[in-house]
């Protein structure tokens, strides 16, 4: 029983000492005239009367005292300091809320900053070029009197060595000035971007003649003869007109026979046998060209000319037993000659190919 009473008196004594310490702290803060801050609590003015002092160690003491007081008043629901962690953070946040505005600027400081800013702007404006027409026109006072009151700061050119070329719009002086040509007067004068006189007319870029297409071909497939410069001609214009297909085919056969006679051919041919093969190739190639439908007109070719001089090369070879028959041979050559075109040579029955003469001799 005695121990219970002693503990109760001890608690009351401790509570009294804490309240006394808080009252002393409140009086010291009230007497401090240099205090700047905001009210901390309005619900419990006995706990925190007045204002907390800025940047002092007494704030921490007040916070510790408030936490101790909250321990001895657990049943007080109206106590805002029930949770020590929440109360301490809330007080610190309220204290730091107006810290940015603690320094008040007077009128002299603001005027001084404004004056400095104006000076900096003037210096930048003096260093930069004020206009895009800087030094693009001659200074009239300098030309008339030989002196200018602005000196080096003048925006006009003092002589042709200072004159700069002005970058103009691409359509500058390419259209007529409506005001000048309707009224007879333009307020812009010589600075107008449109044409006042015929001497001011400029040729618009892109309005000149377009370059001719040097790689264009005529309908017949040959290059146009009206081209000016031969530098950009197409590869087809450099080549001569195409030869007949039969002559090209014969040349290929001769080259194959001369260069590599046994590489790709199963049989080797002599020069006379090649002369026999070439007209036959011409005839079969003509027939294949006529059978294919042409969607667009091909390049024009010259009429096919015969490679060999003999008139009896167009007929396909017949069996050996019928070679001695002169009538059938001549009729076949005549029919093939009529197919070959208008420029085929006339029939000469006296001249015969040596191979046919040998075959006819062997038959006899």
Curated annotation (Swiss-Prot):
GO cellular component: cytoplasm; nucleus; ribonucleoprotein complex
One annotated GO molecular function: mRNA 3'-UTR AU-rich region binding
Keywords of the record: Cytoplasm, Developmental protein, Metal-binding, Nucleus, Repeat, Ribonucleoprotein, RNA-binding, Zinc, Zinc-finger
Region (RNA-binding): 150-191
Zinc finger (C3H1-type): 133-161, 171-199
SUPFAM superfamilies given in the database record: CCCH zinc finger
Free-text description of this protein's post-translational modifications in UniProt: Phosphorylated.
Keyword Nucleus among record annotations: yes
Biased composition (Basic and acidic residues): 102-111
Motif RNA-binding: chain residues: 133-138
GO biological processes: 3'-UTR-mediated mRNA destabilization; cellular response to epidermal growth factor stimulus; cellular response to fibroblast growth factor stimulus; cellular response to glucocorticoid stimulus; cellular response to granulocyte macrophage colony-stimulating factor stimulus; cellular response to transforming growth factor beta stimulus; cellular response to tumor necrosis factor; definitive hemopoiesis
Pfam families for this protein: Tis11B_N, zf-CCCH
Region (Disordered): 102-129, 308-350
Expression across tissues: Remains unlocalized in the egg and early embryo. From stage 21 (late neurula), expressed around the pronephros in the anterior crests, pharyngeal arch, hindbrain, mesodermal tissues around the pronephros and tail-bud. This expression pattern is maintained up to the tadpole stage.
Chief site of localization: nucleus
Domain of life of the source: Eukaryota
Subcellular localization, as worded in the UniProt entry: Nucleus; Cytoplasm
Bias-annotated ranges (Low complexity): 113-123, 329-348
Transmembrane segments: none
Biological role stated in the UniProt entry: Zinc-finger RNA-binding protein that destabilizes several cytoplasmic AU-rich element (ARE)-containing mRNA transcripts by promoting their poly(A) tail removal or deadenylation, and hence provide a mechanism for attenuating protein synthesis. Acts as a 3'-untranslated region (UTR) ARE mRNA-binding adapter protein to communicate signaling events to the mRNA decay machinery.
Listed name of the protein: mRNA decay activator protein ZFP36L2-B
């Amino acid at each position: 029983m005695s121990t219970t009473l002693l503990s109760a008196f001890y608690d009351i004594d401790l509570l009294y000492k804490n309240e006394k310490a808080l009252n002393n702290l409140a009086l010291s803060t009230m007497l401090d005239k240099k205090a700047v801050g905001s009210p901390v609590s309005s619900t419990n003015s006995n706990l925190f009367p007045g204002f907390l002092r800025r940047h002092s160690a007494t704030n921490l003491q007040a916070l510790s005292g408030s936490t101790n007081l909250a321990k001895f008043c657990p049943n007080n629901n109206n106590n805002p300091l029930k949770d020590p962690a929440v109360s301490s953070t809330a007080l610190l946040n309220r204290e730091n809320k107006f810290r940015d505005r603690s320094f008040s600027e007077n009128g002299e400081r603001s005027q001084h900053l404004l004056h400095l800013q104006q000076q900096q702007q003037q210096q930048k404006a003096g260093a930069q070029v004020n206009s895009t027409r800087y030094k693009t026109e001659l200074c009239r006072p300098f030309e008339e009197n030989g002196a200018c009151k602005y000196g080096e700061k003048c925006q006009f050119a003092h002589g042709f060595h200072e004159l700069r070329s002005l970058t103009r719009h691409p359509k500058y002086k390419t259209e007529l000035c409506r005001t000048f040509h309707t009224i007879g007067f333009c307020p812009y004068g010589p600075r107008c971007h449109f044409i006042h006189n015929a001497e001011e007319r400029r040729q618009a870029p892109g309005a000149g003649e377009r370059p001719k297409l040097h790689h264009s071909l005529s309908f017949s497939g040959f290059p146009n003869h009206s081209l000016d410069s031969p530098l950009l001609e197409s590869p087809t214009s450099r080549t001569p007109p195409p030869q007949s297909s039969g002559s090209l085919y014969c040349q290929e056969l001769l080259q194959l026979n001369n260069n590599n006679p046994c590489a790709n051919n199963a049989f080797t041919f002599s020069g006379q046998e090649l002369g026999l093969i070439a007209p036959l190739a011409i005839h079969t190639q003509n027939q294949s060209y006529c059978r294919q439908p042409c969607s667009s007109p091909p390049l024009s070719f010259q009429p096919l000319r015969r490679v060999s001089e003999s008139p009896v090369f167009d007929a396909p070879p017949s069996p050996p037993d019928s070679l001695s028959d002169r009538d059938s041979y001549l009729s076949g050559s005549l029919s093939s000659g009529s197919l070959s075109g208008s420029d085929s040579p006339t029939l000469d029955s006296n001249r015969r190919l040596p191979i046919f003469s040998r075959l006819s001799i062997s038959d006899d």
